[in-house]
Amino acid sequence: MEAKFRLSLLLIILGALAVHGARLENKLENPLPVGAKRSVNCQSMNGICMYGNCPAGTTFCGYDPYTCGSPPGMCCCYD
């Protein structure tokens, strides 16, 4: 029973490391300009980019998939 528990714990840890590695690799492949925040959605319900939906510390909300790395149609917040 303990061996099964240890094996499942090991598999969970390895899975988490694999996911983290994939995310890190994706960030390295798609470098962003300094000051851009990746994929923080600040889109309102009517589809307009609104600064009020951004977290504290940001000064701008806009839609630019090249600059902010957001999916098409999504707004993102900048530092």
Swiss-Prot record:
Signal sequence segment: 1-21
Primary localization class, coarse: secreted
Places the protein is found: Secreted; Nematocyst
Propeptide residue span(s): 22-36
An MF annotation (GO) of this entry: toxin activity
Keyword vocabulary terms for this entry: Cleavage on pair of basic residues, Disulfide bond, Nematocyst, Neurotoxin, Secreted, Signal, Toxin
UniProt PTM comment: Contains 4 disulfide bonds.
GO cellular component: extracellular region; nematocyst
Family: Belongs to the Cnidaria small cysteine-rich protein (SCRiP) family. beta subfamily.
Function: Induces neurotoxic symptoms on zebrafish. Has also been claimed to be implied in calcification, but tests on homolog proteins suggest that proteins of this family have a neurotoxic function and not a calcification function.
Descriptive protein name: Small cysteine-rich protein 1
Species of provenance: Orbicella faveolata (Mountainous star coral)
